[in-house]
């Protein structure tokens, strides 16, 4: 870049500061303000802009000063608590007697410091003086305080001593920044060529247009080849934004959002869903079992027990064996949010029902790139007369289409509480078909004991896995980490 092009790229304030520095070579802000004729803030802003262009440099020195707190002022007059006591301690004295002579707070503070400094020791509740209690560095530092705040050198104290006083909240630290602006060789060379001080217009205003004054004004040139610094506005966390998008889709489709407790009885988490009591998913290695129990609902327990043991009053064999009421009453951290929807159906057995729940579930998983002990699930149910399996497929396909997945397919699946069952999959470029959850029609063994007569379509979809696909992540753990760089650069939407 030529000298002229560099000069053309300088603002008038930068030129004024550079000319001032040419004469001063180096200056503090006050002197620079005086010499350049600018306000101190404007002068320093110009100095920093010159530093970016390597025409000046701004150095900064931080000076630490210390002053006494209110408590420090008091101890400067009366002496530190340990000094007050050791001066009065001619012979061994019980701590109880000391508390009658001094405040309990003073004795409490002093005891530790007396032992630490080796001035006294405590034996069986007796304070015994030991050694010579000469004036310590902390006492000398306290005595040196007078008037304004002081530096370490002015106090004649070392860092360790002042650090102890800071911990005891007897002094406070004040930091004062001193800046010095200096001209560089490149700045000197440019200034020596001569700088033209001419007022420039940075903005074309309506007043300039109306008056025609813009014709005689010089406009500051703009460089369009410089990439501006990125500005990161506030935004919702990408994962939270996707969850809100899913919520909005189901609300727009006429669903009611429901919530439920994190702690559920095994009855609602497993038994009401016709999951056998010896199912592997109920083992300790898969479920967070709690030490508490609860009362299971009497109006359903008998029917659920019969359904498990012999199939109840429908054409089913059940699971056989004896249903354990005590096991059903044990509390767990819910392993799926289906426990919330089945309980909601039991409370609302009459159609129509359209409900969904987006919340956390908990399983004893080893943390790795695709598993965490806590994860979000999107659970939903539709209960109404004449509902069919085809309605379920259409509903799920519509949801995934609205989430931006063009290709959706369904594979046969198996779950203890739905029949028929499917696993929805979406097609992702570079990955192929990806499974995202499970769905099906609730079995009679689930609905009959709860007094539900209409068909129930149900699904449980993996929220975090779907989020990983949408956000292009390969590690599930990144969804829960506060990586500020990733959060700043995350897309609000795709255009």
UniProtKB/Swiss-Prot annotation:
<dbReference type="GO" id="GO:0004826">
    <property type="term" value="F:phenylalanine-tRNA ligase activity"/>
</dbReference>
<keyword id="KW-0547">Nucleotide-binding</keyword>
<keyword id="KW-0479">Metal-binding</keyword>
<dbReference type="InterPro" id="IPR022917">
    <property type="entry name" value="Phe_tRNA_ligase_alpha_bac/arc"/>
</dbReference>
<keyword id="KW-0648">Protein biosynthesis</keyword>
<comment type="subunit">
    <text>Tetramer of two alpha and two beta subunits.</text>
</comment>
<keyword id="KW-0436">Ligase</keyword>
<feature type="binding site">
    <location>
        <position position="417"/>
    </location>
    <ligand>
        <name>L-phenylalanine</name>
    </ligand>
</feature>
<feature type="binding site">
    <location>
        <begin position="377"/>
        <end position="379"/>
    </location>
    <ligand>
        <name>L-phenylalanine</name>
    </ligand>
</feature>
<keyword id="KW-0460">Magnesium</keyword>
<dbReference type="Pfam" id="PF01409">
    <property type="entry name" value="tRNA-synt_2d"/>
</dbReference>
<dbReference type="InterPro" id="IPR006195">
    <property type="entry name" value="aa-tRNA-synth_II"/>
</dbReference>
<protein>
    <recommendedName>
        <fullName>Phenylalanine--tRNA ligase alpha subunit</fullName>
        <ecNumber>6.1.1.20</ecNumber>
    </recommendedName>
</protein>
<feature type="binding site">
    <location>
        <position position="338"/>
    </location>
    <ligand>
        <name>L-phenylalanine</name>
    </ligand>
</feature>
<dbReference type="InterPro" id="IPR004529">
    <property type="entry name" value="Phe-tRNA-synth_IIc_asu"/>
</dbReference>
<dbReference type="GO" id="GO:0000287">
    <property type="term" value="F:magnesium ion binding"/>
</dbReference>
<keyword id="KW-0030">Aminoacyl-tRNA synthetase</keyword>
<feature type="binding site">
    <location>
        <position position="442"/>
    </location>
    <ligand>
        <name>L-phenylalanine</name>
    </ligand>
</feature>
<dbReference type="GO" id="GO:0006432">
    <property type="term" value="P:phenylalanyl-tRNA aminoacylation"/>
</dbReference>
<dbReference type="GO" id="GO:0005524">
    <property type="term" value="F:ATP binding"/>
</dbReference>
<keyword id="KW-0963">Cytoplasm</keyword>
<feature type="binding site">
    <location>
        <position position="419"/>
    </location>
    <ligand>
        <name>Mg(2+)</name>
    </ligand>
</feature>
<comment type="similarity">
    <text>Belongs to the class-II aminoacyl-tRNA synthetase family. Phe-tRNA synthetase alpha subunit type 2 subfamily.</text>
</comment>
<dbReference type="GO" id="GO:0000049">
    <property type="term" value="F:tRNA binding"/>
</dbReference>
<dbReference type="GO" id="GO:0005737">
    <property type="term" value="C:cytoplasm"/>
</dbReference>
<dbReference type="InterPro" id="IPR002319">
    <property type="entry name" value="Phenylalanyl-tRNA_Synthase"/>
</dbReference>
<keyword id="KW-0067">ATP-binding</keyword>
<dbReference type="InterPro" id="IPR045864">
    <property type="entry name" value="aa-tRNA-synth_II/BPL/LPL"/>
</dbReference>
